[in-house]
Amino acid sequence: MADSVLRIGGREFGSRLIMGTGGAPNLSVLEEALIASGTELTTVAMRRVDAETGTGVLDLLNRLGIAALPNTAGCRGAAEAVLTAQLAREALGTDMVKLEVIADERTLLPDAVELVKAAEQLVDDGFTVLPYTNDDPVLARRLEDIGCAAVMPLGSPIGTGLGISNPHNIEMIVAAAGVPVVLDAGIGTASDAALAMELGCDAVLLATAVTRASDPPTMAAAMASAVTAGHLARQAGRIPKRFWAQASSPAL
């Protein structure tokens, strides 16, 4: 049986599905979806949360016993991302951070230069850094060499639901990585999540695929099952693809 435990930066999680909180119509629906997903780690965009009041999303995660993963979503440069991460560490008491440094609001693609700069500073400052990155094997290797605890390549741009645009690059990142690979962004439905795991990813992070679905709790349950199925399939080993048919029963 495949190992169901996700290990990142010395921490262990019983689910390989990491959830995001953006896009939910209200906290009640978000709560139902989080419970249905079985997630043990969920991102929180710190620029959009009032941490001091202890209300809203952070209070919900605390009540459900789900670890909060602060996120530097919306940051446009290394300095802004580093400051946001430092404030999150003060507010939440965790050194784990999902590092996002975006290039522009239209594509929400990572700014590779600023991302590397921010990652270097945060690793030096003792953070456990999980960077949201392009599906670029060279950049992923660079982030690992810096000391990031995982790499989180996108499947396709945030919120597009286009699935995994370049599965070959994801496979190359997985093959070269010595740290966990988390497919982050672009998931549209359960088959996308299963494919990410079949390609060898250690986990999947998604938000709007669930929070903006017609029935978020049901989609969350589907995603959880898909991640488990994809992980099991990867561990089991698929049969090779063949050009010609091959009978499954021997000739008598």
Swiss-Prot record:
It comes from the Bacteria. One of its GO terms (molecular function) is thiazole synthase activity. GO terms for biological process: thiamine diphosphate biosynthetic process. Disulfide bonds: none annotated. The keyword Electron transport does not apply. Its EC number is 2.8.1.10. Pathway: Cofactor biosynthesis; thiamine diphosphate biosynthesis. The active site is at K98 (schiff-base intermediate with dxp). 1-deoxy-D-xylulose 5-phosphate binds at G159, A185, G186, A207, T208. Its main location: cytoplasm. InterPro entries: Aldolase_TIM (IPR013785), Thiazole_synthase_ThiG (IPR033983), ThiG (IPR008867). It catalyses: [ThiS sulfur-carrier protein]-C-terminal-Gly-aminoethanethioate + 2-iminoacetate + 1-deoxy-D-xylulose 5-phosphate = [ThiS sulfur-carrier protein]-C-terminal Gly-Gly + 2-[(2R,5Z)-2-carboxy-4-methylthiazol-5(2H)-ylidene]ethyl phosphate + 2 H2O + H(+). It holds the Pfam family ThiG. It is found in: Cytoplasm. GO terms for cellular component: cytoplasm. The keyword Metal-binding does not apply. Keywords: Cytoplasm, Schiff base, Thiamine biosynthesis, Transferase. HAMAP family: ThiG (MF_00443). Catalyzes the rearrangement of 1-deoxy-D-xylulose 5-phosphate (DXP) to produce the thiazole phosphate moiety of thiamine. Sulfur is provided by the thiocarboxylate moiety of the carrier protein ThiS. In vitro, sulfur can be provided by H(2)S. Belongs to the ThiG family. Homotetramer. Forms heterodimers with either ThiH or ThiS. PANTHER family: THIAZOLE SYNTHASE. This is Thiazole synthase. It comes from Mycolicibacterium smegmatis (strain ATCC 700084 / mc(2)155) (Mycobacterium smegmatis). The lineage of its organism: Bacteria, Bacillati, Actinomycetota, Actinomycetes, Mycobacteriales. The gene is thiG.
